Swiss-Prot record:
Family recorded in the similarity comment: Belongs to the RxLR effector family.
UniProt keyword Membrane present: no
UniProt subcellular location: Secreted; Host nucleus
Placement of sequence motif RxLR: 43-46
Signal sequence region: 1-21
Protein name (Swiss-Prot/TrEMBL): Secreted RxLR effector protein 63
Chief place of localization: secreted
Keywords for this protein: Host nucleus, Secreted, Signal, Virulence
Described purpose of this protein according to its UniProt entry: Effector that partially suppresses the tobacco programmed cell death induced by cell death-inducing proteins.
Free-text note on domains in this protein's UniProt record: Has a conserved RxLR motif that acts to carry the protein into the host cell cytoplasm. Lacks the 'so-called' EER motif, which is found closely behind the RxLR motif in most of RxLR effector family members, but the presence of an EER motif is not always essential for the translocation of every RxLR effector into host cells, or for inducing a hypersensitive response.
Amino acid sequence: MQRFPYSLLLLLLSATNRSRRHHITRPGRSIHWCLVRPTRPNRMLRAIRTCGARYWRNWPLNWPRKAGLTRRSSARIGLSDALRPCPTLFGCFKRRYARQAMSCYCRTEWRVNWLKKKRRGSSRWRRESSVWRCWK
């Protein structure tokens, strides 16, 4: 009888592991939420793994720290405008999405749609008196 390839099992387990929430996802992995930094649009966008309702309960408080933002940088980009759901699964890691016209969901929109997953309209980033806003 052949020996079972345990490395394959480990590979499968690591692929389905959702408990590691602080690591930055790579383009090959599934991306759930991305942190948009409009002040440095040419940089690779950072994606953050989330882990269910317990994580979201104190959402506005724990986001900046989890995202690795300092107080100064979060003030500069405007936290509420900077944190958005990912536009597409792999989209936020393609360089062209990192420009000013990055497609995004508006906050009011995903708040509603996150509970009942309906069709989400597309929107765009716009600069408005030194604040980045998500527009339809």
